[in-house]
Design a protein with these regions (language model features):
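Short catalytic micro-motifs in class I SAM-dependent methyltransferases
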Residues: 92-93
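Conserved alpha-helix/loop element of class I SAM-dependent methyltransferases that forms part
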Residues: 1-13, 30
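Short N-terminal helix/helix-N-cap motif within the alpha/beta-hydrolase-1
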Residues: 26, 98-102
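Short conserved loop adjoining the S-adenosyl-L-methionine
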Residues: 77-82
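Conserved class I S-adenosyl-L-methionine
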Residues: 14-23
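Class I SAM-dependent methyltransferase SAM/SAH-binding core
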Residues: 26-76
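A conserved beta-strand element that flanks and buttresses the S-adenosyl-L-methionine
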Residues: 89
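A short glycine-rich, Lys/Arg-flanked "PGG" loop and its adjoining helix->strand segment in the class I
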Residues: 101-116
Length: 116
């Protein structure tokens, strides 16, 4: 079940996207069906979830010429370049993170100016 309405966004120009706190990857899968020729990144602190996603997406049928990268790490300190993402998703994460404002600062830091 999706908890985010991707249909409310204009995704045609999205070429880089990250799901901050991606968990089981449900938003990554939705993006995989909606985007083409995009670099899609998932980051989570759970090594189990990241390992599972790496295995699952290596054979994922909704590739649409997308590339996927999965990072294990702290969502309060994301190892992604400043102003590099067209779309940042952070769904059902903030309530689980101490100092959630640090997560919001990171999301803003990696988001391209004028992006979503």
């Amino acid at each position: 079940m999706e908890t985010f309405n991707f249909n409310s966004l204009n995704l045609k120009k999205i070429k880089t996207a990250i799901d901050v706190g991606c968990g089981n990857g449900r938003h990554l899968k939705s993006l995989g069906f909606r985007l083409s020729n995009a670099k899609i990144i998932g980051i989570d602190q759970s090594v189990q979830e990241i390992t599972k996603l790496q295995n699952e997406f290596s054979e994922h049928i909704c590739k649409n010429q997308n590339s996927y990268e999965f990072l294990m790490g702290d969502v309060r300190s994301i190892e992604i370049e400043d102003n590099s993402q067209d779309l940042v998703i952070c769904s059902e994460v903030l309530e689980h993170v101490p100092n959630f404002r640090d997560v919001l600062k990171e999301c803003y830091r990696i988001l391209k100016p004028g992006a979503v």
